[in-house]
Amino acid sequence: MAEYKTKKNGLIELFRFLCSIWVAYFHGFFLIHSDKFNGVILPVDFFFLVSGFFFLKSIQKYRDGSVWKGIGFVFWSRTNRFIVPLIIAASSVLLCNIIFPLDLGFNWPLSFLWFFAAQFVYLSCYFLLLKVIKKQFIFNIICGVVICISLSMFLLGIKNFDICFRGPGMLAIGMLLSQIPKLKIKLKNEKKANRLSIAINAIGFVISSALAIYLIYLPDYAIWKIQLICCILFPGIVYFATSIPVRGRFFDFLGEFSVFIYLAQCPILLHYYAFTKDTKAEFYTLCVCAVVLFGINRLVNYIKKRKKALKAQAA
């Protein structure tokens, strides 16, 4: 049997899964509802942070090329793996808006897909900025300014320093974080040094995760708490997680399935408005819909691979 190989980080994929569960939970699609785990946008902040972290390295080869190729890469690299389920989700939201009255609580033009659209717009803007500004340190200064502005909007009276401002800031934090060298201990005994490095990174990951979960679980809402989570603890989680070589098929599955937990919330809007009008009652529908979208995506990707293999054989 061939050895399973993956470039994905298992701990990041695990947190993707937990954050997708968190989003569905706060949208009310769980049998048990609680007023704890405040800050429904925090998991989306984490998604933005991770996207920014991996963005700089992936976009480098397009900095000197065509603008349209770069923007195409920004869009296609984030949708190619699940394009058919994304089309299904977008179509269901569009149909829901046509059939039922607009309700800002659940049913607005993009609904739960706003994250994908915002990510595409923000990353495209950052890509254009990278093409104009050739010196990395100037780009980093601009990222620092964006972070300060986006995480200080509450000072201007904007409630909860709105989502649209937090997204660019979290992407900027991710891009700056990706440039920080990894912690590596140097000793004469290389194996011992590697083990010590992994141990220190693991401790950092556990502490960052534990503090973030503790602060999130507190029922009170405080600006300082969200700033601490967004600027220190979430970056700490990503930094230490990407320094630990945890990989495996199980973690990749969780990361892949997290996308469909997120997307599945769109098709069940139709069922919600037509029948139940109760988000808790949609829990089982959400589970079934996520599994169906996951199966469709696996089938589509399998067909793509088969076609590619047949073309390679024919050539």
Each predicted region: which residue ranges?
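Membrane-cytosol interface segments of multi-pass membrane proteins
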Residues: 1-156, 192, 198, 257, ...
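Short, solvent-exposed loop/turn elements at domain surfaces
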Residues: 32-33, 163, 272
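Internal transmembrane alpha-helix with an interfacial aromatic "cap," most often the third helix
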Residues: 56, 121-126, 174-185
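Short glycine/serine- and small hydrophobic-enriched flexible loop segments
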Residues: 57, 61, 130, 175, ...
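Alpha-helical membrane segments in multi-pass integral membrane proteins
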Residues: 143-150, 166-169, 228-234
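Hydrophobic, aromatic-enriched interface-forming segments
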Residues: 152-178
